[in-house]
């Protein structure tokens, strides 16, 4: 039996309103629990369009057929008009998710975090995280115990900023296994549970065809000797590609693969490491990457 942590990122208003209810229904039918990370502030994701001037981002948008993948409402959100606030407008959906799944903070403003957090000072970052956590806690009526940085934009500054909130774990980076990042003080910080597997948009049209993706991914999972963590998006697997996701769950069950919330991957003793800026194939710009203590 292979256990895989299932992380669901919810980036947008449409992903929350349309994608999450579909995913909740799918997961219920398959008796699966996951970790769902919500963006709760304004939906300004359309402001990423300026990144089309960057060749790597343009190529990613073209090979993943972004217009049909996400829809024009997502691609233009927050451009010609102020972005709609996601959280309170979809409070019933978020509360329903929290009844059955582990719920955490993705971001207050996903676009702002992904585009600007790398240049924020620590207090700005702390204030932004606090705003998101406060809003999510108001909605679900209980403390939030986990978070996942938008776009995996995380480094030492993010690690230090999140320590103020005493969360059970964060999932801010890409890597191979759960670990504890070393703080500036030299002490171990809050546990990190990295995403270990590629997302749909990182590999489609580059490493694999859409129709071959599920078999390709299951091969990766079955060959993984560590603790696999897979991320889906409410805007993708909950919308245009929900049938592909259902097929993945059916095929995974046949192969003895089970999915679980990320917290089930935590153990008593974790290795030490750091979160450093790096790059991965298929994703434009820097992101947080796991570095085991003592390695370079």
Swiss-Prot record:
GO BP annotations listed: 4-amino-4-deoxy-alpha-L-arabinopyranosyl undecaprenyl phosphate biosynthetic process; lipid A biosynthetic process; lipopolysaccharide biosynthetic process; response to antibiotic
Listed GO MF terms: hydrolase activity, acting on carbon-nitrogen (but not peptide) bonds, in linear amides
Family stated for the protein in its record: Belongs to the polysaccharide deacetylase family. ArnD deformylase subfamily.
Entry function: Catalyzes the deformylation of 4-deoxy-4-formamido-L-arabinose-phosphoundecaprenol to 4-amino-4-deoxy-L-arabinose-phosphoundecaprenol. The modified arabinose is attached to lipid A and is required for resistance to polymyxin and cationic antimicrobial peptides.
InterPro entries, per the entry: ArnD, Glyco_hydro/deAcase_b/a-brl, NODB_dom, Polysacc_deacetylase_ArnD
Record has Lipid metabolism as a keyword: yes
Presence of the UniProt keyword Nucleotide-binding in the record: no
Protein name as annotated: Probable 4-deoxy-4-formamido-L-arabinose-phosphoundecaprenol deformylase ArnD
Organism name: Escherichia coli O17:K52:H18 (strain UMN026 / ExPEC)
Enzyme Commission identifier(s): 3.5.1.n3
Catalytic activity as recorded in UniProt: 4-deoxy-4-formamido-alpha-L-arabinopyranosyl di-trans,octa-cis-undecaprenyl phosphate + H2O = 4-amino-4-deoxy-alpha-L-arabinopyranosyl di-trans,octa-cis-undecaprenyl phosphate + formate
Gene name linked to the record: arnD
Keywords of this entry: Antibiotic resistance, Hydrolase, Lipid A biosynthesis, Lipid biosynthesis, Lipid metabolism, Lipopolysaccharide biosynthesis
Top-level EC class: hydrolase
Pathway listed: Glycolipid biosynthesis; 4-amino-4-deoxy-alpha-L-arabinose undecaprenyl phosphate biosynthesis; 4-amino-4-deoxy-alpha-L-arabinose undecaprenyl phosphate from UDP-4-deoxy-4-formamido-beta-L-arabinose and undecaprenyl phosphate: step 2/2; Bacterial outer membrane biogenesis; lipopolysaccharide biosynthesis
Domain NodB homology: 2-260
GO cellular component, one term: membrane
């Amino acid at each position: 039996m292979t256990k895989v942590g299932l992380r669901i990122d919810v980036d947008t208003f449409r992903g929350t309103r349309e994608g999450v209810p579909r995913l909740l229904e799918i997961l219920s039918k398959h008796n699966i629990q996951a970790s769902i990370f919500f963006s709760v502030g304004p939906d300004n994701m359309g402001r990423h369009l300026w990144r089309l001037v960057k060749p790597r981002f343009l190529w990613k948008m073209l090979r993943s057929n972004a217009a049909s993948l996400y829809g024009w409402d997502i691609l233009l959100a927050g451009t010609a008009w102020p972005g709609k606030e996601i959280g309170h407008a979809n409070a019933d959906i978020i509360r329903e998710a929290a009844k059955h799944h582990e719920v955490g903070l993705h971001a207050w403003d996903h676009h702002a975090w992904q585009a600007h957090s790398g240049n924020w000072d620590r207090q700005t970052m702390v204030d932004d995280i606090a705003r998101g956590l406060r809003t999510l806690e108001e909605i679900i009526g209980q403390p939030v115990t986990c978070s996942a940085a938008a776009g995996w934009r995380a480094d030492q500054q993010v690690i230090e900023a999140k320590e103020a909130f005493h969360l059970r774990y964060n999932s801010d980076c890409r890597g191979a296994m759960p670990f504890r990042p070393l703080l500036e003080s030299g002490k171990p910080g809050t546990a990190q549970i990295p995403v270990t597997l590629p997302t749909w948009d990182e590999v489609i049209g580059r490493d694999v065809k859409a129709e071959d993706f599920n078999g390709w991914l299951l091969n990766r999972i079955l060959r993984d000797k560590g603790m696999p963590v897979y991320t889906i998006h409410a805007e993708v697997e909950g919308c245009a590609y929900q049938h592909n996701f259902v097929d993945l769950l059916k095929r995974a069950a046949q192969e003895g693969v089970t999915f679980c919330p990320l917290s089930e991957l935590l153990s008593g003793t974790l290795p030490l490491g750091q979160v450093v800026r790096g790059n991965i194939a298929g994703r434009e710009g820097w992101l947080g990457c796991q570095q085991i203590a003592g390695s370079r």
